[in-house]
Design a protein with these regions (language model features):
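Long, low-complexity or tandemly repetitive, helically biased scaffold regions used
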Residues: 1-181
């Protein structure tokens, strides 16, 4: 009788099954690793870059340079928070699937979407990139080569992670819909 009750609750989504549980856990781990990679990569760049070094590389407007660096710092803060949340979730036993799904949802909106549509409009998403094989982001002004070398590979990684999270949402989890029709 007890097994039938548990099976009914599992079917209603009140108790996660082992397969779904492991999918959420793996996605949380992959997302945390991705965010840590982003933080390390961007921090390495920011630790070696100054406003003067960017302008020496390519004479561009000081305000735009400041906005780009500010956007990178903001992105790093969000990604660091997301990586920390994923790490804490993975250490907890039992694994809290509902909290993990909410964390993945927040990562999507605070990190992934912020990368493609930064608050300060320092660059924008090239929506045709997936069809043309080009860069996923376009700058509003010419930028130094070092900045392109940082962001263009990151854009491919962000595209992949966005697809992973959208695929995860579409694979039957109870996570809130990521993309609104």
């Amino acid at each position: 009788m007890k097994e039938a009750k548990c099976e009914r609750q599992r079917h209603e989504g009140k108790i996660p099954n082992e397969m779904g549980h492991s999918i959420v856990r793996v996605q949380t781990q992959q997302t945390g690793e991705f965010l840590s990679m982003v933080v390390n990569t961007v921090n390495d760049y920011l630790n070696q870059t100054t406003l003067e070094s960017l302008q020496a590389e390519l004479p561009i407007e000081k305000g735009y340079c400041c906005d780009v660096l500010s956007t990178l710092r903001r992105m790093t803060v969000f990604c660091e928070g997301g990586a920390d949340a994923c790490r804490r979730l993975l250490m907890q036993e039992p694994f809290q699937e509902a909290r993990a799904e909410k964390t993945l949802y927040n990562v999507y909106h605070q990190c992934i979407e912020e990368f493609f549509m930064p608050k300060k409009d320092t660059w924008c998403e090239n929506s045709r990139a997936s069809y043309t094989g080009g860069s996923a982001i376009e700058f509003y002004h010419a930028v130094p080569a070092s900045l392109e070398q940082l962001l263009l590979p990151l854009s491919a990684a962000f595209l992949k992670m966005r697809e992973e999270l959208a695929h995860y949402e579409a694979s039957g989890s109870s996570m809130a819909p990521i993309r609104q029709p």
